[in-house]
Structures are given as C-alpha cells and as structure tokens.
C-alpha cells in the first residue's frame, strides 16, 4: 500500500493550480442521467472518487469519454451520454466506495420512475444519515422502501410531482438530490432551507444550461419549475475551494508565499477571513489568491457551519496549521460528530490538542517532529500532510488512498513549490 514521505522544514513558494472541485463534479456527473443528450464537463479533476463515479454511471448505461481539455482550461474533460438507461440499480460493490453514489437516486427516479441504490460508503465521519434525501423524494410523491441494505424508490404513475420540501437542517447532498429530482417533476417544487454551498450553485448553473428552470439560485429557498425533458450542455466545473484552502494552510505553516491559481475568493470568503485573522497576508489577484505568511501565526476561535460559514471540510487543515500558532485556539465542530480522528496522529507529531465532545482546544507549540502517522479520512489525511511540511525530520503518512479521493497530483503540486515529498509504494 502506498505511503507519502515528507521531509519537513521547506518554505513553500510559487504557484499551485487549483483543480476542478471534487464536491461539485460528483453531483454534476449524475446529472447526466437526466437527459439522453451528451453532457460535457470541463476542468475534470483526476481523482479516485471521479473514477468510482464513472464506474457507477457506466454500470447504469452511461457512456463516458475522457479527453484532454481544449482552449483556456488545462487538464481533462469528460463527455457523458445516457441515451438509454441500462439499469436502475446501483450495486453495493460500487456504491460502498463512495458516499456521493447516493446522488444517482434522484436523477434515476426522475427519469425512469424507479431506482434501487445501495446504502453508501465513503468517509468514516459519523453516521451521515440519508433520511433527508428520502424525505425530500417522498415530498415529490416517491414511495421509499429500505430493504437488505438498499433504498428502493418508485415514482407514482405519471412520474414525480412538484411539492414543498422543507429541510429541518441544512444538507448539501439532500439538496442536490432534491434539485435533480425536481427538475423533471410535474409542476412546481419549492425547497426551503436549501444548502447554499458554491457547489450547489454550480450544479444549478449546469442544470439551467441543460434547460432546467430554477429560481433563487444561491439562496436558501429554491423554486423549480419542472420540465418534460432536459438537453445536453457543456459546463466548466468550478475550482475546488477546499483544495485551495488546504494549500493556503500549507503555505501558512511553512512561512510560505503561494499563489492559488484559479481560486475564487467569493467561494471561500469565510476561510479567507480566518486566514487573515491568523496573521496571513491575503490578496486577490487577477489569476487567483495569493497567500503570504510574513508574520507569526496567531491562534483562532472558530466554529464550522453551513455555507457561508466556515466549512467543516477545512477544520482538520486549520487545526494542523494552528498547532504552530501563538496562543490557544478553540475549534468547534457543529456539522459532523466523530470528525477529530486526526487529533491522535497530530499529537504523535508533538501537537498539544485536547478534545471534549465537539470542541478541540489547540495550544500552540514551538515545533512539530516527523513521525509515522495513519490517515483516517480525506481531510484528516491532508491535515497530516500540512503538519509534516513544517515538522522537523521525516514523516510517513500511511493509507494515502484517502488523499487520492480528493487531491489531484498532490505530490507534484507541492514539489513544484518547494516541498520535499514523494510517494513510496509497498
């Protein structure tokens, strides 16, 4: 099994290109099920989760063709064509690899009137129940049955019908499933307390390019006017705000100066506020966001929250950065339980962190030391990379398959800005 070896103490300096957003593309790809025409997504990241999504869509009858992007967008593009649906069953052996597989449920149900999807796998972060997804589809008339580890959903005669969906708590995935189901439902659907994340906006923009009628994009109340059919489109995947924030933390902890090429400030406003508060110099430039660490890091008090609040997906990376900040930091995780699994590994490297319930108290230390550490989930693994970049000596991060789910060409990007990092097989 691969591991990543890092020799810390090198200041990061240069440009890091930000890839297409993982959390956006994993909703955009299932949207191809909503039309028999082709959907082309530009700025496709090279990630294990993208490969898993391709495998699942192929199983359902979607043809996928990946090519090098043309024009102004570097990297890859994918064309997905679901001219016929070969199966409405998303099997366990594929779905278990990736939680986002549940996002085929809404599109399949909307187009075919039925869907059977295995309960999902993916990150080991709390329970992440899918009950909000199911309640949303029931509000559109679906009949839902849970049996033998599968969700079986069936639309009423004549297909899904518009309705009112009111989420008791904000859920990104449930909002995405509800939107994709509603665009082909008969009549009008109102979604109250919808998630407002930039990835939701990106999905809506793609669906509208395909002919969907959605009002209120970017707000917590969406009104969707169902269509008989959608057509094909070409859409550019938004830049990954979590990847950009992660590399900002890496620049900060190494005293670096890095331009996050392609990052959009509007997508990560609260992260930038906290980075500035920690003592970093942040400037928005024509082609990205520049992060300069020209002063000692300062401790922070922050809580995770749905967008536009501080993202839970950045909590672990900030914790690693704050391990070397002056003073005491207090982090409160309000979104997921059990999202402090990286703490014991950071402590092995010399961090002073105490966790009580949903609150973590980080007392800044003068230095970290390299160690062998184990990644437990996607963002936790990145926190260990960040800590290792500043640690004295060598760190080996095991179970790096977690990183491959969400960070494209990690070693290549960090090496290009001065990190001593390599992937070791076996």
UniProtKB/Swiss-Prot annotation:
- Superkingdom of the source species: Bacteria
What reaction is this protein's catalytic activity? Answer: phosphoenolpyruvate + UDP-N-acetyl-alpha-D-glucosamine = UDP-N-acetyl-3-O-(1-carboxyvinyl)-alpha-D-glucosamine + phosphate
Give me the residues that bind UDP-N-acetyl-alpha-D-glucosamine, please.
99, 128-132, 313, 335
User: What pathway annotation does it carry?
Assistant: Cell wall biogenesis; peptidoglycan biosynthesis
Can you tell me where the transmembrane regions are?
A: none
Could you say which protein family the record assigns here? Belongs to the EPSP synthase family. MurA subfamily.
Residue numbers carrying 2-(S-cysteinyl)pyruvic acid O-phosphothioketal: 123
Q: What is its EC number?
A: 2.5.1.7
A molecular function annotated in GO for this UniProt entry is: UDP-N-acetylglucosamine 1-carboxyvinyltransferase activity
According to UniProt, the name of this protein is: UDP-N-acetylglucosamine 1-carboxyvinyltransferase
Q: Which NCBIfam families match?
A: murA, PRK09369.1
Catalytic positions? 123
Organism, by scientific name, is Zymomonas mobilis subsp. mobilis (strain ATCC 31821 / ZM4 / CP4)
**Binding of phosphoenolpyruvate: at which residues?**
22-23
Determine if DNA-binding is one of this entry's keywords. Answer: no
Any idea where this protein resides?
Cytoplasm
Q: What does this protein do?
A: Cell wall formation. Adds enolpyruvyl to UDP-N-acetylglucosamine.
Any Gene Ontology CC annotation: cytoplasm
Q: Kindly state which keywords UniProt assigns to this record, in alphabetical order.
A: Cell cycle, Cell division, Cell shape, Cell wall biogenesis/degradation, Cytoplasm, Peptidoglycan synthesis, Pyruvate, Transferase
Q: Which HAMAP family match?
A: MurA (MF_00111)
Per its UniProt record, what InterPro entries does this chain match? Enolpyruvate_Tfrase_dom (IPR001986), Enolpyruvate_Tfrase_sf (IPR036968), MurA_subfamily (IPR050068), RNA3'P_cycl/enolpyr_Trfase_a/b (IPR013792), UDP_GlcNAc_COvinyl_MurA (IPR005750)
Task: Respond yes or no to whether keyword Cell cycle is given for this record.
Answer: yes
The record's annotation in Gene3D superfamilies points to: Enolpyruvate transferase domain
Q: Which GO terms describe its biological process?
A: cell division; cell wall organization; peptidoglycan biosynthetic process; regulation of cell shape; UDP-N-acetylgalactosamine biosynthetic process
């Amino acid at each position: 099994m691969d591991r990543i070896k890092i020799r810390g103490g090198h200041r990061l300096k240069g440009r890091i290109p930000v890839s297409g957003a993982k959390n956006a593309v994993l909703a955009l790809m299932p949207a191809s099920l909503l039309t028999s025409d082709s959907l082309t997504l530009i700025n496709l990241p090279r990630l294990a989760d993208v490969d898993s999504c391709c495998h699942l869509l192929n199983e359902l009858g979607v043809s996928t063709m990946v090519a090098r992007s043309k024009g102004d967008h570097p990297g890859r593009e994918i064309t997905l064509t679901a001219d016929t649906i070969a199966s409405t069953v998303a099997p366990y052996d594929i779905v278990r690899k990736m939680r986002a597989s549940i996002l085929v449920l809404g599109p399949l149900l909307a187009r075919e009137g039925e869907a059977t999807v295995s309960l999902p796998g993916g990150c080991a972060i709390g329970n992440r129940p899918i009950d909000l997804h199911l309640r949303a589809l029931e509000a559109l008339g679906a009949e839902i049955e849970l049996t033998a580890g599968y969700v079986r959903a069936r639309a009423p005669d004549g297909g899904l019908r518009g309705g009112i969906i009111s989420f008791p708590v904000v859920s990104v995935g449930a909002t995405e499933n509800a939107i994709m189901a509603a665009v082909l439902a008969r009549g009008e659907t109102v979604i109250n307390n919808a998630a407002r994340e930039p990835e939701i906006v990106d999905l809506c923009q793609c669906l509208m390019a395909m002919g969907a009628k959605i009002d209120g994009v970017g707000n917590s109340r969406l009104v969707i006017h169902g269509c008989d059919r959608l057509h094909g489109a070409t859409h550019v995947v938004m830049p990954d705000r979590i990847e950009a924030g992660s590399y900002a933390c890496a620049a900060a902890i190494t005293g670096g100066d890095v331009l996050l090429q392609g990052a959009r400030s509007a997508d990560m406003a609260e992260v930038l506020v906290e980075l500035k508060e920690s003592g970093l110099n942040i400037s928005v430039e024509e082609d990205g966001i520049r992060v300069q660490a020209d002063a000692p890091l300062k401790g922070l008090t922050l809580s995770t929250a749905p967008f536009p609040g501080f993202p839970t997906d950045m909590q672990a990376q900030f914790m690693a950065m704050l391990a070397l900040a002056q003073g005491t930091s207090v982090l409160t995780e309000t979104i997921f339980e059990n999202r402090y699994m990286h703490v014991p590994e950071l402590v092995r490297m010399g961090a002073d962190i105490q966790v009580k319930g949903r609150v973590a108290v980080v007392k800044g230390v003068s230095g970290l030391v390299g160690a062998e550490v184990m990644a437990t989930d996607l963002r936790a693994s990145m926190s260990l990379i960040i800590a290792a970049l500043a640690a004295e000596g060598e760190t080996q991060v095991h179970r790096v398959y977690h990183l491959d789910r969400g960070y494209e060409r990690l070693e290549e990007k960090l090496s290009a800005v001065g990190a001593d990092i390599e992937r070791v097989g076996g």
